[in-house]
Regions:
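Long, terminal "pre-/pro-" and other extracytoplasmic accessory regions
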Residues: 2-268, 280-293
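Short proline/glycine-enriched turn/loop motifs at strand-loop junctions of beta-rich domains
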Residues: 271-274
Length: 293
C-alpha cells in the first residue's frame, strides 16, 4: 500500500542526484510558475474533496490496494501484472451491504469513526485503479472476503484502519484493499523540477503556524562547495497547504558528487495548520504529517 510513496522518494532522490552532477549553479526555483502550480494543486484538491462528498476525517496516502505474501513462481508473472491492470473479479457472490462504521486509530491513541465499503465495492475499487493494461493476463478470481485491520499511512501519520482481505484462486497470497469509503484521492502529476523540490513528509502542530517539510537535497549547506541552502514558502487554502521549497545553491566550478541527503526547511503559515492536508508541489498528492502533541 506504500508503493507510490516509495516511488515518490526514489524519484526525488534521482532528481537530486542528477542536479548534484551538474556543473556550475543548478537552475533555481522559478517563483511565478511555482505559485501558479501551487494554486492549481490547491484547486485540484478542492475538486477531489467535493467529488468525495465531504472533507474526510481520514485521508489515506499511497496505494489503497496491496497484498499479503509473495506470488508463487508459477503464477507470479501473471498475477503481478493482472493486479496492476485491475483484473480482479469475484468468483462467488460477495456482500454488497456496507458493514457498520469502522474505526481508525493513530499511534497516539486518537481514534475516529469512518464509513466502510462493502466487500463487492472494494473489488470494484480495485478494478478501477488500473496502472498498466495487460491484454494477455488471466483474471484474479476472488473466492472469499474478510474484514480485518491493517497499517495505513494517512495525512496525519501512520494509523491502523479497516481493510478488506480477499482470498484468490490458485494462490496463497491475499489481496487487500483499504475499506474506508469515499476517500479523497487525486492522481499524481509530474512537473519539472524548476517549480521547486518534491517533499515527502511534513511536521508541525494543529495549533501552530510553523510547518517543516522534508525532502532530498544536497548533503552540505550553501556555504560549502556543491552545497545548498533551502527556504520554504506556504501557499494556502481552507482545505490544504502547498509548500514551495526554493534552492539556494553555492556557486561551484566543476562537477559535484552524485549524492543526495535528507534535508528540511520550515515555512510560516498565515493561519494554524488545523485539519488541513499538506500537498506536494510536484505530484499534487498529500504527504504524511507528524503532529506534535
Amino acid at each position: 500500500m506504500a508503493r507510490k510513496a516509495a516511488g515518490r522518494y526514489a524519484s526525488a532522490l534521482l532528481a537530486a542526484i542528477a542536479l548534484a552532477g551538474c556543473m556550475g549553479v543548478p537552475g533555481a526555483t522559478d517563483p511565478a510558475p511555482a505559485h501558479q502550480r501551487a494554486q492549481a494543486v490547491l484547486s485540484k484538491w478542492a475538486g477531489a474533496v467535493a467529488a468525495a462528498g465531504a472533507n474526510a476525517a481520514v485521508t489515506p496516502i499511497g496505494e489503497l490496494t496491496g497484498q499479503v505474501g509473495d506470488w508463487e513462481e508459477a503464477v507470479g508473472d501473471n498475477n503481478k501484472r493482472a493486479l496492476m491492470a485491475g483484473m480482479v473479479a469475484s468468483a462467488t457472490a460477495l456482500s454488497e451491504e456496507a458493514p457498520q462504521d469502522g474505526e481508525v486509530t493513530w499511534q497516539d491513541g486518537t481514534t475516529t469513526k469512518v464509513p466502510l465499503l462493502a466487500a463487492q465495492q472494494a473489488i470494484v475499487a480495485i478494478e478501477n485503479t488500473t496502472e498498466a493494461p495487460c491484454s494477455d493476463c488471466s483474471m484474479l478470481m476472488v473466492t472469499d472476503a474478510r474484514l480485518t485491520s491493517g497499517p495505513i499511512q494517512t495525512t496525519r501519520g501512520p494509523a491502523t484502519a479497516p481493510v478488506w482481505e480477499f482470498t484468490v484462486q490458485d494462490t496463497a497470497v491475499k489481496l487487500t484493499r483499504v475499506a474506508i469509503a469515499n476517500p479523497v484521492v487525486v492522481a499524481p502529476d509530474e512537473v519539472g523540477s524548476g517549480l521547486g523540490l518534491s517533499i515527502d513528509s511534513a511536521s508541525g502542530s494543529v495549533s501552530g503556524t510553523e510547518l517543516t517539510v522534508a525532502f532530498v537535497g544536497a548533503p552540505d549547506p550553501g556555504n560549502m562547495p556543491c552545497g545548498e541552502d533551502y527556504t520554504a514558502e506556504a501557499v494556502e487554502s481552507d482545505l490544504a497547504v502547498v509548500v514551495i521549497v526554493t534552492r539556494h545553491p553555492h556557486v561551484t566550478i566543476g562537477a559535484c558528487s552524485a549524492v543526495g541527503a535528507r534535508r528540511t526547511a520550515t515555512a510560516t503559515l498565515a493561519a494554524p495548520l488545523g485539519d488541513r492536508v499538506v500537498l506536494d508541489l510536484q505530484q499534487g498528492t498529500p504527504v504524511p504529517v507528524v503532529l506534535a502533541p
